[in-house]
Amino acid sequence: MAKELKFSEDARSAMLKGVDQLADTVKSTLGPKGRNVVLEQSYGSPTITNDGVTIAKAIELDDHFENMGAKLVSEVASKTNDIAGDGTTTATVLTQSIVNEGMKNVTAGANPVGIRRGIEEATKTAVDSLHAMAHEVKTQEDIAQIASVSSASEETGKLIAEAMEKVGHDGVITIEESRGVDTSLDVVEGMQFDRGYLSQYMVTDNDKMEADLDNPYILITDKKISNIQDILPLLQSIVEQGKPLLIIADDISGEALPTLVLNKMRGTFNVVAVKAPGFGDRRKEQLQDIAILTGGTVITDDLGLELKDTTIDQLGQANKVTVTKDNTTIVEGAGSKDAISERVEFIRNQIGETTSDFDKEKLQERLAKLAGGVAVVRVGAATETELKERKYRIEDALNATRAAVEEGFVAGGGTALINVIKDVAALKETGDVQTGINIVKRALEEPVRQIAENAGLEGSVIVEKMKEQKPGVGFNAATDEWVDMIKAGIVDPTKVTRSALQNAASVSALLLTTEAVVAEKPEENAPAAPAAPNPGMGGMM
C-alpha cells in the first residue's frame, strides 16, 4: 500500500483540523447546561449522550491526516477515562487550547522543543498546586456531592454514597440494567463466589431452591474428596457439635457425594458441598482468602495437611452461608480483623505491582470481596436510549467518586484550574520556554470559558471576573450565581482534574513537535467491470 507524506506546517495544520472537529463536537457537552450529542449505531436506536470519551471514540474522519489529529485527542480522553474514569471533556478542551495556541507560535517561528519544555514545567506546577489545595473525602455527604455533580443528578449521588457506605471504598459496585423504570441498589453482604451446590438435595428452602446454613463450620481444601472415609472422623465430630457444614473442595465424587446427600436427607446432619472457585494458582489464592475471612485453614498438600487428620479447630466459621445453584455467599466470617487487614494490604500491593490488566481485575475482585462485599446498582429507564444515557452518567459518577476517595477533591466547574494560574504565572523563564508556560496559563481558563458559553454567557467576562474572586469562589452555571463552590457542593476529584491536564499537556506537546506525518494513500475508485453474460440463460425471454 502506497503512503502519503506531509511535512512541517502542512502536517501540523492537517492534524489541527482533526483536533478541532473532534474537540468542537465534544466540548458542547461541558457543564450543567452542556448539550447532548446523538451517535448513530450500526444497529438499533441511536445513542444520546454527553459522555466525552464515548463521543470521541465514535468519531472517524474521511481525511487520514485529519483523522490522526482527531484520534490523538480521542487518546487523551481515553487515557483520562482509564486513569480517573471522568474528566474526558475537560481533557479534550484543554488539549484543543494548548494545540491551537502552540501551533500559532510554531507557525510564527517559535522552537517547538522550547515550547514543550515550558508546557511540561507549567503543568507540573499546576498539578502540585492542585494537590496542595485538595480536600480529603471524609463524609458520606462529600461522596454524594461528587457523584451528584458528575451525574447531574442528586438521586444518583445519594445512591452511590449509600452503596459506598455499605461495601466500603474498596468494595465492588457493579452497574446492571433493570427490567423496570426505577433505579435501585442491592447489596450482597460478605463474600460471594460463583459456585453452587453439587446436589439439589442439599437445599433447605425448596421454594427458593437455596441452602441456608446458620453458624456453620466450613471445610476448605484444594483436594478431591472421593472416599468418605477421608473425612469420616471430622463428620463425627461435627455431628456431636450439632452444627451444619459447608464443604469447599476441588471436587466431591465417587461414594462421597451420595453418602453426604443420604445423611443429609436422613437428618443425620446438615451439609452442603460446593466446588472451589477459580482455577490453578488463582484457586489456591481464593481459598486462602476464604480461610482468612472465616478463620480457617486450607487443607492442602502444600502445608503437608491431610483430610483424615483434619480437626474442628482447622475449620472456618461464619454467621450465615447461603448457597444457590450458581453462587455461594458467606456472611460475617469469623476471621480476625487483623488477619483480614493484612491480607487486604497484601492484595493491594500485588495490584500495584502487576502489569497485566486481567490480573489486576481479578486481584481487585478479590480485594473487594475481602474488603466489603458487592453492591449492584440496577439502572432503570422508560426507553433503551434513556437507559444507555443514564448508565453512562452513573458509571462516570462512580468513577469520579472513587477518584476523589484516592486523591481528594477541589472546587469544581473549572474553578480550581483558574485558582492555580497565579502559581503558573509566577514561573519566570525566557524565550520559547516562557511561551510554553503562557500557553498553559491560557489553557487553564478554557474549561470555565466553555462552561459559561454553553450556558449562553460571554466566557471571557466570566473568566476575568473569577480571577478577581477569593480562591474557591466560582460561577455556578446551573443557577448563574457566584458561590463558594465547595460549600455549594460543586466539586471535582483532584485525580480527574490533574489527569485531564497532564494527559492534555502530554499529547499536545507531542503534536507540536511533529515534523512529518505518514498516512495511507486513498485508493482511487476503479471503474466497475461490465456484467458478464450468463451462459446458462441463453435463449430465454
From Swiss-Prot:
Query: Which species is this UniProt entry from?
Result: Lactiplantibacillus plantarum (strain ATCC BAA-793 / NCIMB 8826 / WCFS1)
Task: Indicate which residues the UniProt annotation says bind ATP.
Answer: T29, L30, G31, P32, D86, G87, T88, T89, T90, G413, N476, A477, A478, D492
Q: Write the gene name.
A: groEL
Q: Where is the composition biased (Low complexity)?
A: 525-535
User: What are the protein's UniProt keywords?
Assistant: ATP-binding, Chaperone, Cytoplasm, Isomerase, Nucleotide-binding
Could you tell me which CDD domains the record lists for this protein?
GroEL
Q: What is this protein called?
A: Chaperonin GroEL
Q: Which InterPro entries match?
A: Chaperonin_Cpn60_CS, Cpn60/GroEL, Cpn60/GroEL/TCP-1, GroEL-like_apical_dom_sf, GROEL-like_equatorial_sf, TCP-1-like_intermed_sf
Q: Where in the cell is it found?
A: Cytoplasm
